[in-house]
């Protein structure tokens, strides 16, 4: 069972028939035309994303890092256009992950990702996650925006109280700042709604998407209100491959499936079942596991033993999971997972916790990885 989903990308499993059909059809029509020209399908995707969110404008790109770079540029350009180019700094949070470009690495602020790449780019002030007083102290005359993930994925599936996010919104309103949500991992249904901000009841000014947006085909998007995007003019940003017809076809197909009635109810139902079952395993093996955390099907199990050993042992049982910070193992099931697959995954976890960890069984080149859409 693949409970990595390509790190929260394959939200509809592997080779979902509707996505396959959409890509096959588009591949016979048009592959690439650059962003010099508009396309009806691209306009439709942008309109659908705006209709389902707070946004008025969408910029298409190819990845989460590119979507985040766009978000950073939009925030800085907004203040420059208002006559305040000195307002370019962003408040970010410890444990965050925003990408691997130089700009997003600086926003991430993690030493292990920055090692060997020289000094980080200027313009980011990192504070402890969930510390409102630290945020207030970090805001100054050069601050442009606050950037945060609704749930930290790479950082260990860590969230913060809803009141904290509401306070961030108020701080932005009081100080003329923009609020940016990095929903690259939390967006597109992963937390039980199309976007995590809806469950928080806190609306950002800018939001980045990627990962599950294309269901496995590379695409990213930066969404913004008309006010936040007011500094962006033709030529101020661009992407050769962003919004190419194949990626647009995949993303529209993903929305076709996700916007059907009952889809997110199913995600929430499977989330509750998975977390309840995982919690029972945690209760039985406190020397191995200590906590279940997360929202929707962005679920983490905090380990007492090294999380890497647990990931390896689960892989030997033919369950694919992925590690995260804070010694957490992420269970990122496809959003179409069923009850039997949830039960099977938890049974596999139960089995590995009963034996010594740290040594993987020999693996053979003929082994197949079982996925939610058959074997690879």
Label each PLM-derived region with a short phrase.
Residues 1-376:
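Conserved N-terminal phosphate-binding loop of PLP-dependent enzymes in the Aspartate aminotransferase
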């Amino acid at each position: 069972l693949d409970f990595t989903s390509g790190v929260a990308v394959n939200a509809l499993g592997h080779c979902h028939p509707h996505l396959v059909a959409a890509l096959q059809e588009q591949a016979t029509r048009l592959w690439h035309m650059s962003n010099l020209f508009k396309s009806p399908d691209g306009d439709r995707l942008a309109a659908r994303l705006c209709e389902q969110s707070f946004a008025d404008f969408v910029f298409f790109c190819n990845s989460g890092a590119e979507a985040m770079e766009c978000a950073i540029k939009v925030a800085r350009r907004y203040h420059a256009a208002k006559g305040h180019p000195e307002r370019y700094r962003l408040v970010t949070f410890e444990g965050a992950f925003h990408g691997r470009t130089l700009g997003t690495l600086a926003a991430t602020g993690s030493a292990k990702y920055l090692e060997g790449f020289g000094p980080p780019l200027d313009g980011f002030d990192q504070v402890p996650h969930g510390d409102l007083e630290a945020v207030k102290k970090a805001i100054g005359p050069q601050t442009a925006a606050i950037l945060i993930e609704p749930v930290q994925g790479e950082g260990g599936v860590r969230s913060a109280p809803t009141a904290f996010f509401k306070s961030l919104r108020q701080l932005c309103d009081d100080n003329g700042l923009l609020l940016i949500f990095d929903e690259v991992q939390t967006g597109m249904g992963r937390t039980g709604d199309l976007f995590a901000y809806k469950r928080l009841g806190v609306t950002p000014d800018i939001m980045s998407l990627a990962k599950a947006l294309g269901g496995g085909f590379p695409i990213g998007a930066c969404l913004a209100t008309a006010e936040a995007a007011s500094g962006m003019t033709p030529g101020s940003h661009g992407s050769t491959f962003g919004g190419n017809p194949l990626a647009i076809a995949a993303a529209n197909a993903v929305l076709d499936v996700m916007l059907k009635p009952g889809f997110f109810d199913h995600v929430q139902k499977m989330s509750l079942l998975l977390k309840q079952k995982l919690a029972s395993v945690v209760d039985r093996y406190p020397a191995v596991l200590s906590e279940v955390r997360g929202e929707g099907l962005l679920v983490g199990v905090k380990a007492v033993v090294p999380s890497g050993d647990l990931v390896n042992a689960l892989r030997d049982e033919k369950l694919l999971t992925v590690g995260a910070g804070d010694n957490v193992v992420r269970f990122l099931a496809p959003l179409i997972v069923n009850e039997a697959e949830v039960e099977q995954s938890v049974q596999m976890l139960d089995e590995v916790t009963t034996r010594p960890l740290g040594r993987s069984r020999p693996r053979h080149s003929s082994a197949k990885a079982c996925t939610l859409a058959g074997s690879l």
